[in-house]
Amino acid sequence: MEFKHISVLLEETIDSLNIKEDGVYVDCTLGGGGHSKEILKKLSHKGKLIGIDQDTSAIKAAKERLKDYENVIYVHNNFYNIDSILEELDIDKVDGIIMDLGVSSYQLDEASRGFSYMKDAPLDMRMNREENFSAYNVVNSYEEEELFRIFKNYGEEKFSRKIARFIVEKRTENPIETTGELVEIIRKAIPAKFQREGHPAKRTFQAIRIEVNKELQILNKAIEDSVNRLNKDGRLSIITFHSLEDRIVKVKFKELEKPCTCPPSFPICVCGKEPQIKIITKKPIEPSKEEKEINSRSRSAKLRVCRKI
């Protein structure tokens, strides 16, 4: 299956990076190479792009899309490791970093990946298929209380308790092996009148995907490490697709902009924590009405940008 992914907030993201033609840039979520190609168009032969992705299918697709460019380094890894990746490449500082945290259209559309609640497939949801831990393990081995926790915290699911109970009851008969089986369990757990608000499995699938790929833990550390690797005036641009991610980015940016932990009553700062960034986007940038109409998957996207000081 061809790797297809429509880059969200493409123009806004590229503009936010304030690209220098001889700069060094990192695309932490290479995907099909949409954002990367626009960055490369603005670079001279002295500039450089590092493209990171944990999905080998994405890297293969990006290499094909970017085959006309020689100043690209491809890295099969998780952007959680951005610090060690740059260390291994002997790159100290960079001028801009982008993270697009959405699941690609390819991953959603390829049924065998198990990300979609619209297609029956094995329970998988691994971004990196070289990892062993998958959605199957979460659904079939987590205790009821643990399932409740992730559905509530990562999916903000109103019926987390009931869904967790129904899953545990069902798997005592036989292991739950497919997305279709899981969707049916969720449908039975959620009252019919609440199933009119979008697909009933959406929040639960989001929660399981986040748990399988440790997405929220990765994001916090990656933001800190990325800021540390930016040159002065370098930009970090992050696109999120749900409120949990957006909240993490918003809070972390605020912590890095105003890190002082001194009590308000102190006349001067004595903690010694200096601001590291300036937030560029006081409110997140959202897709235009036109983009939302063209690409429905862009509707929940938000872009936040900061500048290293």
From Swiss-Prot:
Q: Give the similarity note.
A: Belongs to the methyltransferase superfamily. RsmH family.
Q: What Pfam families has UniProt attached to this entry?
A: Methyltransf_5
Any single biological process term in GO: rRNA base methylation
What is this protein identified as? Ribosomal RNA small subunit methyltransferase H
Briefly state the protein's biological role.
Answer: Specifically methylates the N4 position of cytidine in position 1402 (C1402) of 16S rRNA.
Keyword entries, A-Z: Cytoplasm, Methyltransferase, rRNA processing, S-adenosyl-L-methionine, Transferase
Where found, per UniProt? Cytoplasm
* Top-rank lineage group of the source organism: Bacteria
Where S-adenosyl-L-methionine is bound, by residue? G33, G34, H35, D53, F79, D100, Q107
Name the catalysed reactions. Answer: cytidine(1402) in 16S rRNA + S-adenosyl-L-methionine = N(4)-methylcytidine(1402) in 16S rRNA + S-adenosyl-L-homocysteine + H(+)
GO MF terms listed in the record are: rRNA (cytosine-N4-)-methyltransferase activity
Mind naming one GO cellular-component term on file for this protein?
Answer: cytoplasm
Which EC number(s) are documented for this chain? 2.1.1.199
